[in-house]
Design a protein with these regions (language model features):
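Short beta-strand/loop motif that positions the catalytic acidic residue
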Residues: 96, 102-104, 110
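Alpha/beta-hydrolase-fold enzymes
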Residues: 1-75
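Active-site nucleophile elbow and catalytic-triad environment of alpha/beta-hydrolase enzymes
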Residues: 71-93
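Short, conserved loop/helix-junction motifs that constitute active-site signature segments
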Residues: 93-97, 136-138
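Conserved beta-strand scaffold positions in the cores of enzyme catalytic domains, especially
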Residues: 6, 102, 143-145
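Conserved loop-alpha-helix segment in the C-terminal half of the alpha/beta-hydrolase fold
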Residues: 106-145
Length: 177
């Protein structure tokens, strides 16, 4: 069957790094990845993401911590290169041939110590980047911000999840009717 719509809610359209890291660091690391693809590098993701989710820490979800570790594993340079190359295409602007809903939190934070921001904002991606590059896409694109949403919107608190699903199903009903 053909794809008739798409829902994007973990839009990794850019690395959430400083301007210097974006201009020099990521391209340099990506270039190294061309020649040393298996070399591993720290992910640089916020350490509070898994604790914000897991029941044994601050979250409400029970999942296997061997599969989603408390501390992020290192990533291969080939992974960084692949993401960076794909992001360059997104940055130019892409055409999506099916109706697309891009949903994201209303704010980004980067807590250095535990606080509730980890459960009420995106601590992995910069939502301004998501919006910026989603607006460069052409086709039938709709953007939707979710107040107090986490990075993974469907793992947010129950009231936020209800809003996510309400918006998603309203959009699907409208697009599919």
């Amino acid at each position: 069957t053909a794809l008739t719509a798409t829902f994007i809610f973990l839009a990794f359209y850019d690395f959430n790094k400083t301007a210097f890291e974006q201009k020099f660091g990521i391209p340099c690391i990506s270039q190294f990845g061309k020649y040393t693809p298996d070399l591993e590098f720290p992910s640089g993701l916020n350490r509070w993401y898994t604790p914000s989710l897991h029941l044994s820490m601050y979250g409400e979800w029970n999942f296997n911590l061997e599969w989603k570790k408390e501390k992020f594993p290192k990533v291969r340079l080939s992974f960084i290169r692949a993401i960076y190359e794909a992001q360059k295409e997104i940055h130019k602007g892409v055409y999506l041939s099916v109706p697309t809903l891009v949903m994201y939190s209303n704010r980004t934070t980067n807590p250095k110590q535990w606080n509730s921001d980890a459960q009420h904002s995106d601590i992995i991606l910069n939502v301004k980047d998501i919006e910026k590059y989603a607006l460069k896409m052409s086709g039938n694109i709709q953007l939707c911000t979710i107040k107090n949403g986490m990075h993974d919107l469907v793992l947010s608190s129950a009231p936020v999840r209800e809003k996510v699903y309400s918006e998603l199903f309203q959009w699907l009903n409208f697009k599919m009717s």
